Amino acid sequence: MFNKHSVEIDWGGRPLKLETGKIARQADGAVVATYGETVVLATVVAAKAPREGVDFLPLTVDYQEKTYAAGRIPGGYFKREGRPTEKETLVSRLIDRPIRPLFVDGWRNETQVIATVLSHDMENDPDIVALVASSAALTLSGAPFKGPIGAARVGFVNDEYVLNPTLDEMVDTQLDLVVAGTADAVLMVESEAKELNEDIMLGAVMFGHRHFQPVINAIIELAEKAAKEPREVTVIDNAALEKEMLGLVEQELRAAYAIPVKQDRYAAVGKVKEKVIAHYFPEGQEPKYDKLRIAGVFKELEAKIVRWNILDTGKRIDGRDSKTVRNIIAEVGVLPRAHGSALFTRGETQAMVVTTLGTGEDEQYIDALSGTYKETFLLHYNFPPYSVGETGRLGGTKRREIGHGKLAWRAIHPVLPPHHEFPYTIRVVSEITESNGSSSMASVCGASLALMDAGVPLKRPTAGIAMGLILEDKRFAVLSDILGDEDHLGDMDFKVAGTESGITSLQMDIKIEGITEEIMKVALGQAKDGRIHILGEMAKALTNARAELGEYAPRIETFKIPTDKIREVIGTGGKVIREIVEKTGAKVNIEDDGTVKVASSDGEAMKAAIKWIKSIASEPEVGQIYDGTVVKVMEFGAFVNFFGSKDGLVHISQLASARVQKTSDVVKEGDKVKVKLLGFDDRGKTRLSMKVVDQTTGEDLEAKDKVAEGEKAPREAAGE
């Protein structure tokens, strides 16, 4: 019944098995990849006919984690998986980025890749397994895919690279780098690093590339057994049409791409397009070509003119040479009520970045496949349509926004202070107010400034830069701080973020094969020069974190109480802690180990809350005087609440120095009194006294009498 085929190899000391022919047999391609005991099913289905009216590759990649893979049931009312989590979105992009450039030009059939995590062994992260499985499924599917690709995760521990570190090993690594590519070239890199230098980062990329070669060979071996016949793609020869169009508009198009201002340039290019449309689609005549074909050829001309100009003259669209960074203006403290804020402008790209400091109540609860945890650093990236002069629908967060936000998060995360030293929940929001390339790196620069403006003690300021590449035969140009057009028309998008000491984040997407180690080395070196320049411009606004937190930011005090006192501080059903919060206005968070965090922007409120909590958690001392409140009046005395939640009895004989007939003659419920702790009776009940305390000044009358007697005794002994 099953026509099974499988290949198994040892990869990094663990077995990797690829199997097809048993599960999801109606998909064009389906592979179950097993690494250790982590299992991922990847399927590929491509439509039989091209999608009408599109001039792009209609590819969709979906990565999904099933909670049963970890032996768990989803939370929530419905008890089933909901919308994609942040990790699912990020891994979907991680798979999409290296496979998209490898489809044959002209493939317009709807293609969907679905990677489903079926089992997770809590050691091997499913993302790499999903990438490998997706590559294998595409290779078997018959889709025009110029793969296969391999992928690997690289760690760096004790000055040595580690292949596919386990989740436990990731705790100690200085590097988390994912690299994917073909047998000959690297296509994608995604990483976070603890300020590592360029040589270590490049070495990690090449280490990963070498070590995923056995995976590529295994996929090829499986394809030889089970691959479908490749589907044909009709490729139209546009050489003659391109030559004709070039003769028609070359001069105008070159002139348009010499205009440095984006909106003016787009207007000029628009007029050239109108000329092309008027020429090829004259009114009243049957057109010779369809509009998509003309638009595609025009786009090719745009790319060639921009690329030739850069390689031939060294001049870019806006007149810069390949290494120059656009003009930068950095400002901090731009929003009066925000805890920290910055406006970072680089050419026609601008980010307004805002930092908000919160408490433990604001931590994000993450219910991940590998377990639940709390996230104390959040970075959100928003890209509204007005930033590029367009209208658009505002709605849910898009995949691109999630991806760019995570890239900026990775750049900043390594320089944050440890949470035990700076016990705040930190949220950074980057609002892209203008965009013409490199908005994610503007977010990194703005985030660094906004955090320092808020008083967050970063290890060092952090900056980011986006690099591009133009490669024609053996000629190439690496471009610093690319524009949006240079991103679209170039061969590489290479984002590098870090401090003056090293790289904290590296993301690379390459659209062509043939990027050599030499080119990557040049790009990294040029990126370092650009990063140092940008850090210098940022320093004109702020060089280090402010000594004090923002005026409106909460202050947090941390202290410990005995664990057996936690229940008393919280109270039945949270009654006591709610009262503390309501009456003082401070926020209180108590952890299982007895760590208490009290937060408030009002210093007096914080002091009151701390005093209240400590009074509950501490034990009163015999002989000390305390403020109290009469809570109950009885015939034999009064019960007084003191020292937080403690209650004690003032016997009728201890109410006043004179004889008291009725307790109510001296006190009534609600009276504020001063009491001295005399001790405890045989049953452990607290004994208090009012008569030995001056109810006005709080002075200990008993102690005063003893002092007086002590002074009197020597005089009597002398015969006075």
Curated annotation (Swiss-Prot):
Its cofactor is Mg(2+). Its EC number is 2.7.7.8. The keyword Nucleotidyltransferase applies. GO terms for molecular function: 3'-5'-RNA exonuclease activity; magnesium ion binding; polyribonucleotide nucleotidyltransferase activity; RNA binding. It is an enzyme of class 2 (transferase). It catalyses: RNA(n+1) + phosphate = RNA(n) + a ribonucleoside 5'-diphosphate. Residues 554-613 form the KH domain. Keywords: Cytoplasm, Magnesium, Metal-binding, Nucleotidyltransferase, RNA-binding, Transferase. This is Polyribonucleotide nucleotidyltransferase. It comes from Bradyrhizobium diazoefficiens (strain JCM 10833 / BCRC 13528 / IAM 13628 / NBRC 14792 / USDA 110). The lineage of its organism: Bacteria, Pseudomonadati, Pseudomonadota, Alphaproteobacteria, Hyphomicrobiales. The gene is pnp.
